Amino acid sequence: MLIIETLPLLRQHIRRLRQEGKRVALVPTMGNLHDGHMKLVDEAKARADVVFVSIFVNPMQFDRPDDLVRYPRTLQEDCEKLNKRKVDYVFAPAVEEIYPQGLEGQTYVDVPGLSTMLEGASRPGHFRGVSTIVSKLFNLIQPDIACFGEKDFQQLALIRKMVADMSYDIEIVGVPIIRAKDGLALSSRNSYLTAEQRKIAPGLHNVMNSIAEKLIAGNRELQEIIAIAEQELNEKGFRADDIQIRDADTLLELTETSKRAVILAAAWLGQARLIDNQSVTLAQ
């Protein structure tokens, strides 16, 4: 496994791989890798000849400076995990390598609509930062496929739209959420939880299951369903942030013709803002 930190060296290897006709997969990450990331790596390895994993804590997508400062940086441990998985390349650039002129005045990629709705409404600029760094990684690594987790449901939808709108010839692969045995979705931010909070954390998934059961049963009183769910979360020790029930294919409001719904949930538990989602097939 080769660790690349500079753009000239990256470009040198990309040129060689292209000349050799290799099929390249990219797994973009911000590090602090867990089993969910490893599932992305496994999917990439199954679909390509060469796998790149990028590790870059992207300052452009953080809406709160304190969150950027305390985001876990575990490059050595991450590389050890990836080496055991037989990843070919790790691209781990410094911020100055990606944004040599700084963030102010940086050209960016913005995806209208999807970047400012739902999660984007509560985190201004977040998705603009995501789409910009993913676009830069696509330009630099020129992958044939890229793997993203379905835990970040809106992010995956945004990247699919960006790829379509910008005419990237890249297959986007969504990989299902990986959960702990108690149902908690794996996330780098789970490391913010205390031992006591970790015991409470699966409650978010349990509340989503309750919402899903109501939708499957034909209940469409969405405001009431959401209000009850928020109350349940608060009673469990969470601070409910946002719960939405949307059309899984458009992320717009549910209509009578919607075939699938997605439950999008975000809640604070101590210093950790946990997000999760669950798709539901609706009775027609």
Curated annotation (Swiss-Prot):
Catalyzes the condensation of pantoate with beta-alanine in an ATP-dependent reaction via a pantoyl-adenylate intermediate. GO terms for biological process: pantothenate biosynthetic process. Belongs to the pantothenate synthetase family. The active site is at residue 37. Disulfide bonds: none annotated. GO terms for molecular function: ATP binding; pantoate-beta-alanine ligase activity. Pathway: Cofactor biosynthesis; (R)-pantothenate biosynthesis; (R)-pantothenate from (R)-pantoate and beta-alanine: step 1/1. The keyword Methyltransferase does not apply. It comes from Salmonella paratyphi B (strain ATCC BAA-1250 / SPB7). It is found in: Cytoplasm. Beta-alanine binds at residue 61. Keywords: ATP-binding, Cytoplasm, Ligase, Nucleotide-binding, Pantothenate biosynthesis. The keyword Acetylation does not apply. This is Pantothenate synthetase. InterPro entries: Pantoate_ligase, Pantoate_ligase_C, Rossmann-like_a/b/a_fold. CDD domains: PanC. The gene is panC. The reaction proceeds by a bi uni uni bi ping pong mechanism.
